[in-house]
Structure formats: structure tokens, C-alpha cells
């Protein structure tokens, strides 16, 4: 096929252009691409939407300039540009760059360079030229798993509403969407049906709800059978057997704070000094409202902190705090983009960095933003590394953006000047020695 081409569907003009560099020299120049682009875009209709494709990102900043040389420049913002799709960086990443989406998807066969799972992306453009996306995870057969109530455990009623059993289910299928999830609660001794119904979708993976429990089921061993129905007609089923005790009281044994990955900034693996004994009993489960990637939860001040990721244009991304004992949501702070990796806590402050290179410091009690910094990666647009904090200093960023910040004020203490970064290993910063 041609090296570059364009086509129209509805009110959208799609333009596919080639990369200007690679393992071997090309038989075309950026000037050749510029000349074709200029002529092609001169023919589009007024107010027609424009969506661009290229192997690489045109510009990491918001300028959206195509530059062949100083005398041959095209400004894509002069058109009704809606998005640019690219793949060179090998990660899953969506940015809203001042009204234009840049959308990158990792490789289908092996996932992203940043450990992103294998995936593909579904993109829709409606009659009003609005773009929606859904990242689909690959190679997953129809599956379903019951998160709560857990198999062979005792389950209690909700702490807020009496006689209601909380239910949480994870289900997914690569080739089709989950249309609905149903449940049947039955007596495990005689298989007599007690109640049945449907669960509600919480995220693309999780469905949940509560079951109104009859009073005469107290203390009985019950079976919960859940079934996922997928849009192509396939199904998946799972069963959990448990004992229902309405007033079952769980004992919480609090250990030391776990304020960063592996408990300390050296990531040497924290020591659990609590008196926990096996087997463990699920105390609570909750849903953050979005997916979680490499961010492990941290615990401090009787709170559990976690951050979420969303690789779609919805950018449903948050830093969340939950009550340690009940799982109740205490606060939620919306970030500009996905927090892909570890977060940290010290002296009442939670710190996190998102994929768009924003560094946040939040008050752990209220979730209020204390300060925010922009991490400059010197033309590289994506931050997937984890940060840490130690003795009042936040260590964040990577490469040209690797910096130390005062935890209380956000003031920059130092910035790395010795080396830069590109695509490579995904890390969490570690404090070693003094």
C-alpha cells in the first residue's frame, strides 16, 4: 500500500503518515510528507474533524506542529483536530492535550514496555465527532471469580445496612463485553434456592451489590453461585460456600505503618511484628471506581491509600483513602492522569506522581492538595515510575526529571543533570545507604 494516505468516514478525515526514522533510511523525506499533507488538508471540508495516525508522537507538548524544516511547518491546531494515534512508545497512555487526545496502545502480543498487559483498543467516533475509547485486555477466556463472600469463610452483614450481604465479583472476557451478572443464593445442604438477582457494574472488571438476607438463614452454610453473561452468548460461572453470621465480629490487629513499597524507602522488605495467625479472614473489600496497575496500597494512621489508572479518554483516575477497619471511603482526589506505580506517605502527607508528569502532595486526613509540581522529562511525555519519601524528602521523576523535593513545601532541592531516559525498565526509586 501507499506510504501515506487519507480517507473520509462521516464527518471525519483520517490521515495516515509514516515515521521519519527507523532502523533503515527511508526513501522519502519530511519535506515529501509535508508537501503531501499540505495538499491533502487543503481539500478537507470546513469544520471537518481530523484524526491523525503516525507510528510516533508528532509533538510531546501541546503545540501539534508538523515541521519539515524552518520554512515548512503545519499547525494541526489550525484544523478541527480531534486526536493523534501512535504506538512507538510501547505503552497504554491517553492524554487530553488542550482539547486534542493523543492515544498510545502497547503491543497486542506481548504488552507494553512498562509491564502493561497485552491489550488492544476499541475507539468510537460518534455523529458529533466525540471520541470514546475502551482498552481491552487480550488472551482472557471467559472467567469469573467471587471476591466476597470468600469460599470457606464466615461472612457478616453490611455494617451500614442490616441483613444485607455484600457481594463482589470480578469477571472478564477479551472477545466480548459483560452484559450482566446474576446470582443465586441457596442452602448448601439441600440446594434449595433462597434468593436470586442481578449485580451492578462497578468497573470494567468488577460487579457487586448487596443481597437482602432472610432472618432464618443465620448461622447456615450457604452457596453463592454467580454467572456472567457475555455479549456474544458465552457464560462463566463460579460458586462460593460460606457461613452467614449477621453479627460476626472481626478482630483487627493493627501493625506498623506501611508507608511505601515494602514498608521502607530502601524497599528491603518490612518486618511484620503483629501477632497475626493463619488462616486469615477477609474483613472487607471495596471498589476504587477504576483499575489499579502497579500501585500497591500503603497503610498509615488507620487509613489505606491507593491510586488508580485509566488508559481511556474517560481518565477516571484518583488517589483514594479508606478507613482501615471498615473499608469506608474517606476521600477521593482526582488526578490529571493515571498513577501507574507506587505512592508514599510520611508525616500526614501522601505523595504520588501521574503518567502526565504531575507530582501531588495531599493532606492524608482530608485529601486536600497541599502542593503540586510539574516534572520535566525533557520532551519525553510519559512517567510510569514509582516514587518514595524518606526523612522529609520526596524522590520523584526519572532521568532528566529525577528530583528531590521538600515534603512540606514542594520546593525543589535538586534535579538530576547527568543522564536522561527513554523507553526502558520501569522502576521505583530506592534510598540506599546514608
Sequence positions of predicted segments:
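His/acidic metal-ligating clusters that form di-metal
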Residues: 13-15, 24-101, 181
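Binuclear metal-dependent phosphoesterase catalytic core
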Residues: 93, 100-170
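A short loop-to-beta-strand structural motif that recurs across blades of beta-propeller domains
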Residues: 119, 317-320, 358-360, 400-403
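Long, low-complexity serine/threonine/glycine- and acidic-rich segments characteristic of extracellular
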Residues: 144-246
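Blade/loop signatures of beta-propeller domains
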Residues: 251-282
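Short glycine/acidic-enriched loop and turn motifs that connect beta-strands
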Residues: 265-266, 310-314, 357-358, 401
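Extracytoplasmic beta-rich repeat domains
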Residues: 284-298, 308-317, 329-344, 369-390, ...
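Short loop/turn segments that connect beta-strands within beta-propeller blades
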Residues: 323-326, 363-367, 406-410
Amino acid at each position: 500500500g501507499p506510504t501515506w494516505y487519507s480517507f473520509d468516514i462521516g464527518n471525519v478525515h483520517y490521515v495516515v503518515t509514516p515515521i521519519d526514522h527507523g532502523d533503515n533510511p527511508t526513501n522519502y523525506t519530511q519535506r515529501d510528507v509535508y508537501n503531501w499533507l499540505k495538499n491533502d488538508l487543503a481539500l478537507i471540508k470546513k469544520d471537518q474533524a481530523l484524526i491523525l495516525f503516525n507510528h510516533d508522537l508528532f509533538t510531546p507538548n501541546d503545540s501539534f506542529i508538523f515541521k519539515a524544516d524552518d520554512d515548512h511547518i503545519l499547525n494541526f491546531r489550525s484544523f478541527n483536530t480531534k486526536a493523534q494515534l501512535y504506538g512507538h512508545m510501547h505503552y497504554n497512555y491517553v492524554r487530553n492535550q488542550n482539547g486534542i487526545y493523543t492515544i498510545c496502545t502497547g503491543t497486542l502480543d506481548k504488552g507494553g514496555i512498562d509491564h502493561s498487559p497485552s491489550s488492544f483498543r476499541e475507539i468510537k467516533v460518534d455523529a458529533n465527532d466525540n471520541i470514546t475509547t475502551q482498552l481491552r485486555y487480550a488472551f482472557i477466556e471467559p472467567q469469573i471469580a467471587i471476591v466476597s463472600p470468600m469460599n470457606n469463610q464466615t461472612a457478616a452483614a453490611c455494617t451500614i445496612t442490616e441483613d444485607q450481604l455484600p457481594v463482589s465479583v470480578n469477571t472478564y472476557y477479551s472477545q466480548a463485553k459483560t452484559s450482566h451478572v446474576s446470582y443465586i443464593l441457596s442452602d448448601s445442604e439441600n440446594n434449595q434456592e433462597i434468593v436470586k438477582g442481578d449485580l451492578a457494574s462497578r468497573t470494567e472488571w468488577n460487579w457487586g451489590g448487596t443481597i437482602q438476607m432472610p432472618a432464618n438463614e443465620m448461622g447456615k452454610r450457604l452457596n453463592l453461585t454467580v454467572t456472567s453473561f457475555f455479549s456474544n452468548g458465552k457464560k462463566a460461572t463460579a460458586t462460593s460456600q460460606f457461613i452467614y453470621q449477621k453479627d460476626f465480629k472481626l478482630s483487627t490487629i493493627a501493625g506498623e505503618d506501611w508507608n511505601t513499597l515494602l514498608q521502607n524507602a530502601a524497599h528491603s522488605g518490612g518486618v511484620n511484628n503483629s501477632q497475626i495467625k493463619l488462616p486469615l479472614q477477609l474483613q472487607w473489600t471495596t471498589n476504587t471506581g477504576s483499575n489499579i496497575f502497579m500501585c500497591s496500597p500503603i497503610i498509615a494512621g488507620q487509613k489505606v491509600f491507593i491510586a488508580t489508572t485509566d488508559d481511556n479518554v474517560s481518565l477516571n483516575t484518583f488517589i483514594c483513602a479508606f478507613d482501615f477497619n471498615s473499608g469506608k471511603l474517606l476521600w477521593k482526589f482526582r488526578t490529571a492522569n493515571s498513577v501507574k506505580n507506587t505512592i508514599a506517605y510520611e508525616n500526614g502527607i501522601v505523595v504520588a506522581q501521574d503518567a502526565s508528569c504531575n507530582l501531588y502532595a495531599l493532606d492524608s486526613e482530608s485529601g486536600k492538595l497541599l502542593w503540586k509540581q510539574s516534572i520535566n522529562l525533557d520532551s519525553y511525555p510519559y512517567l510510569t515510575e514509582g516514587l518514595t519519601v524518606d526523612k522529609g524528602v520526596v524522590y520523584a521523576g526519572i532521568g532528566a526529571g529525577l528530583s528531590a523535593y521538600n515534603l512540606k513545601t514542594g520546593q525543589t532541592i535538586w534535579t538530576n543533570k547527568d543522564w536522561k531516559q527513554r523507553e526502558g525498565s520501569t522502576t521505583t526509586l530506592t534510598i540506599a545507604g546514608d
